Amino acid sequence: MPRVKRGVTAHARHKKVLKKAKGYYGARKNVYRVAVQAVTKAGQYAYRDRRQRKRQFRALWIVRINAAARQFGLSYSRMMDGLNKANVEIDRKVLADLAVHDITAFGQIAEKAKAALAA
């Protein structure tokens, strides 16, 4: 069985990690042992934050809808209850976008929610 020298594969592996660590500060960008830790931790943060991003955007949409709904005399929860009763199926992302960019359309939707709550 011939002897396998792993210089080529080790170099390729090091190069791959150091390429991912490009732009990092200090030893993290050019010392393999430190770069491995930094890249691994970055991957953990990325994995966690891809999930957190969904929660954070939903929270942002709710804040925007609540602020706009209060201009029309409704709280967020009353607005959503009214929309459910009126069978209006607009998701929070679209509602928040309307609240920011087209307040008149949002106002019409808010009036529908109010009417459904009164009925």
From Swiss-Prot:
Record-level GO cellular component terms: ribonucleoprotein complex; ribosome
SUPFAM superfamilies assigned: Ribosomal protein L20 (SSF74731)
GO biological process per UniProt: ribosomal large subunit assembly; translation
Pfam families given in the database record: Ribosomal_L20
InterPro entries linked to this entry: Ribosomal_bL20, RIBOSOMAL_L20_CS, Ribosomal_protein_bL20_C
Superkingdom: Bacteria
Record keywords: Ribonucleoprotein, Ribosomal protein, RNA-binding, rRNA-binding
Molecular function via GO: rRNA binding; structural constituent of ribosome
Assigned protein family: Belongs to the bacterial ribosomal protein bL20 family.
Function: Binds directly to 23S ribosomal RNA and is necessary for the in vitro assembly process of the 50S ribosomal subunit. It is not involved in the protein synthesizing functions of that subunit.
Descriptive protein name: Large ribosomal subunit protein bL20
Organism: Thioalkalivibrio sulfidiphilus (strain HL-EbGR7)
